[in-house]
């Protein structure tokens, strides 16, 4: 009965994502609508879709798993770097990119670069598109694979079948609704991710014996609760965190300035003045979400200390939220539905990244390579058909 409730919750979630795509299927009249939502995105959707598409399942699996094993230093400095990178990206890049891309009527990042630097031969268009395709197609495929692995590990469902179903859902709402569907589903997925973090955190603290017990356990472990050292679980010792470690860990935040699927959100907002509000929303959510994720890792270890959760070594530490969700599901039907929502949050984290990267890769093929570099003359209807066909091929 528990598994049925969990699976039903996840199925309802997936169907809802498809319905969003169908709801926006009639709103795409040209390439600008399909790839940028007609530049009519509001500040909330812009902010939350950008951050949801950035975080991926790493927020709900990798980060709490790292905190569970090593303490707060490594995930903490990573979070600081990512928060700074997020804020600076919105502050420095967003307004200029929105203004210039609108003036140049550019709807993709490679096209913007080509027009901005007067590339008459469209070499920047082609090069940028190839780079996006080379790196985003495998990344998107890994997202589909992650969805398949999640269903297989939880319910014993055939891996290939689960992956194909997940891919069909993501491709389905992307191909029908385009950018509007992707950003709207990303907003919904960010909410589901947030609810998952809150639910796991509240239950976990109770199962660990309370917040004081969680902190006391963390304090008893060498290097666990300091930003200047990491905990070595195998040896039970602390390893100092050098300046080089700090800088290299924080450097993750530098990647934001070159992420096409995030930059497209800047180009799509309805008014550049609203980017200030978007920046505040995005920065606050990122800080809160990553802080909660790190604390969940610490709470998970507290649950292990209290005997509520087995010790998770190595890569199994990344399943700490999944294990907690399974414990929640044992407390009745409503609890099983909540557990399904938590697992849907992990699925949402993966889907929100995969759909955005798939759309960016598809736009690179149909818009930058075929039309700009290849000089194919297509009507708006033909261009939309090429865009949708490219998504299927990607």
Show which residues each predicted segment covers.
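Extracellular loop-to-transmembrane helix junctions
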Residues: 2-24, 67-107, 111, 193, ...
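Helix-loop junctions at the membrane interface of multi-pass solute transporters
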Residues: 24-25, 33-38, 51, 65-69, ...
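Helix-loop-helix module between adjacent transmembrane segments
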Residues: 77-174, 251-255, 346-356
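Loop-to-transmembrane helix boundary motifs in multi-pass membrane proteins
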Residues: 116-126, 133, 363-394
């Amino acid at each position: 009965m528990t598994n049925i409730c969990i699976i039903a919750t996840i199925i309802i979630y997936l169907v809802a994502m498809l319905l969003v795509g169908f709801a926006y299927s009639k709103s795409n009249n040209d390439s600008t609508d399909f790839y940028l939502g007609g530049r009519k995105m509001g500040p909330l959707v812009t902010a939350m879709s950008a951050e949801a598409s950035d975080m991926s399942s790493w927020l709900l699996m990798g980060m709490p798993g790292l905190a569970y094993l090593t303490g707060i230093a490594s995930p903490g400095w990573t979070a600081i770097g990512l928060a700074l990178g997020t804020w600076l990206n919105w502050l420095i890049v967003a307004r200029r990119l929105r203004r210039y891309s609108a003036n140049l009527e550019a709807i993709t990042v490679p096209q913007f670069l080509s027009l901005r630097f007067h590339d008459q031969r469209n070499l920047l268009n082609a090069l940028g598109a190839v780079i996006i395709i080379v790196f985003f197609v495998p990344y998107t495929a890994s997202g589909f694979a992650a969805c398949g692995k999640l269903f297989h590990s939880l319910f014993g469902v055939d891996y290939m079948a689960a992956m194909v179903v997940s891919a069909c859902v993501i491709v389905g709402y992307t191909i029908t609704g385009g950018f509007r569907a992707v950003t709207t589903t990303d907003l919904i997925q960010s909410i589901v991710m947030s609810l998952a973090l809150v639910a796991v955190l509240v239950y976990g603290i109770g199962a660990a014996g309370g917040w004081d017990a969680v902190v006391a356990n963390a304090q008893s472990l060498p290097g666990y609760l300091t930003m200047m050292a990491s905990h070595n679980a195998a040896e039970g010792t602390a390893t100092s965190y050098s300046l080089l470690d700090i800088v290299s860990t924080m450097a993750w935040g530098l990647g934001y300035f070159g992420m096409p699927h995030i930059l497209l959100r800047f180009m799509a907002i309805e008014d550049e003045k609203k980017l200030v509000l978007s920046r505040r929303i995005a920065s606050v959510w990122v800080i809160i979400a990553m802080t909660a994720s790190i604390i969940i890792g610490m709470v998970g270890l507290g649950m292990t200390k209290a005997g509520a959760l087995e010790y998770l070594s190595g890569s199994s530490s990344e399943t700490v939220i999944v294990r907690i969700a399974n414990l929640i599901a044992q407390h009745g039907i409503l609890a099983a539905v909540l557990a399904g929502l938590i697992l849907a949050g992990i699925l949402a984290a993966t889907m929100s990244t995969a759909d955005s990267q798939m759309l960016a890769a598809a736009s690179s093929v149909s818009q930058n390579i075929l039309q700009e570099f290849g000089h194919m003359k297509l009507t708006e209807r033909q261009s939309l058909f090429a865009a949708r066909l490219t998504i299927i091929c990607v």
